UniProtKB/Swiss-Prot annotation:
GTP binds at residues 17-24, 35-41, 67, 121-124, 149-151. This is GTP-binding nuclear protein Ran. It is found in: Nucleus. Residues 6-170 form the Small GTPase Ran-type domain. InterPro entries: P-loop_NTPase, Ran_GTPase, Small_GTP-bd, Small_GTPase. It comes from Brugia malayi (Filarial nematode worm). Found in a nuclear export complex with RanGTP, exportin and pre-miRNA. NCBIfam families: small_GTP. It holds the Pfam family Ras. GTP-binding protein involved in nucleocytoplasmic transport. Required for the import of protein into the nucleus and also for RNA export. Involved in chromatin condensation and control of cell cycle. It comes from the Eukaryota.
């Protein structure tokens, strides 16, 4: 998607099982939602998400599948020329985490060495099934991981900031203003947030299991 301006622009491929909240997540960014384009040949919506950094603007053209993944794998055209990716699962549904290696395999088959963030969505839901200590796939594959909650905007910007730093080669890059986001539909419990952040920090220092079983 060529644009007439000089904003650095990157194709971001958003994948994961159906129902994990990918569309809800991308729609939080209001200007991206307003300016999205539908690509009929591939059946995808492309949301241009602009973020303001201390080095100027950066745009992620986020490709959202519009639910096609419910009918099997995605076509290569979805992945081709992808420059970065987010793999999403639902922390309230173990099977969506169990399928992460399949999404990762499909992704790297087409886009070999791109920066990838793994996101566990719906951490606002009290009945969390996939706990921090069981989320090890990203450590084995050198991906970044974030807990997120699309409906509360919790950690919304984190995956984009990490990817922007990788893509622009600047570990000190910062976002200087938050994009306009849809108002939170739910509130995160601060005690729960503190607990989860502690668990993630502890899990990052734990030894990895020897086998390939990720659950």
């Amino acid at each position: 998607m060529a644009t007439g301006d000089d904003i650095p622009t990157f194709k971001l491929v958003l994948v994961g099982d159906g129902g994990t909240g990918k569309t809800t997540f991308v729609k939080r960014h209001l200007t991206g939602e307003f300016e999205k384009k539908y690509v009929a040949t591939l059946g995808v919506e492309v949301h241009p998400l602009i973020f303001h950094t201390n080095r100027g603007q950066i745009r992620f053209n986020v490709w959202d599948t519009a639910g096609q993944e419910k009918f099997g794998g995605l076509r290569d055209g979805y992945y081709i020329q992808g420059q970065c990716a987010i793999i999403m699962f639902d922390v309230t549904a173990r099977v969506t985490y169990k399928n992460v290696p399949n999404w990762h395999r499909d992704l790297v088959r087409v886009c070999e060495n791109i920066p990838i963030v793994l996101c566990g969505n719906k951490v606002d839901v009290k009945d969390r099934k996939v706990k921090a200590k069981t989320i090890t796939f990203h450590r084995k594959k050198n991906l970044q991981y974030y807990d997120i909650s699309a409906k509360s905007n919790y950690n919304f910007e984190k995956p984009f900031l990490w990817l922007a730093r990788k893509l622009l080669g600047d570990p000190n890059l910062e976002f200087v203003a938050m994009p306009a986001l849809a108002p939170p539909e739910v509130q995160m419990d601060p005690t729960m947030v503190a607990q989860y952040e502690q668990e993630i920090a502890a899990a990052a220092n734990a030894e990895l299991p020897d086998d390939d079983e990720d659950l």
